Each structure stands twice: as C-alpha cells, then as structure tokens.
Amino acid sequence: MRFLNIFLFFAAIIAFATASQVFEEDEIDMEPRITCDLIGNERLCVLHCLAKGFRGGWCDGRKVCNCRR
C-alpha cells in the first residue's frame, strides 16, 4: 500500500510538470491597449516602453503604442 501511494505521488508530480510545460509553450501574451487611449496619450506609451526596456515609443493612427528599439 505504501509503495502504491509513493508511486501515485510521483506519477502525479510528473504528469503535472509535463502538463505545465505544454501550457507555457501555447500561452499567448495578450496585453491591453490602453496606453494610447487614456489621459496623456503618448506619455503613457513612452512610460510603458521605457518600463519594458525600450528607448521610448509613440501612438500611431490606430491608437496602438509602438516602442522604439
């Protein structure tokens, strides 16, 4: 009985670990597009890009923030 419990414990850990790896590969990073719509327009876009490590950014005609490299 003890061997069965240990076996099931390790089988559950392995199943969980492999399921997590597959999920991370299929995950899409969706970010809301609110930096160009709120008060300050391009200021929030520039701050957003600076926080991500870029040199700045601007809002295009579709109100989408574009970061400079």
Swiss-Prot record:
What protein is this chain from?
Answer: U-Asilidin(12)-Dg3a
Q: Where in the cell is it found?
A: Secreted
Domain remark text: Has the structural arrangement of an alpha-helix connected to antiparallel beta-sheets by disulfide bonds (CS-alpha/beta).
Give me the Gene Ontology terms describing cellular component.
Answer: extracellular space
Further notes on this entry?
A: Is abundant in venom, since it accounts for 45.2% of precursor counts.
* Entry's Gene Ontology molecular function annotations: potassium channel regulator activity; toxin activity
Which of UniProt's keywords are assigned here? Disulfide bond, Ion channel impairing toxin, Neurotoxin, Potassium channel impairing toxin, Secreted, Signal, Toxin, Voltage-gated potassium channel impairing toxin
Q: Which residues form the signal peptide?
A: 1-19
Return the similarity comment. Answer: Belongs to the asilidin-12 family.
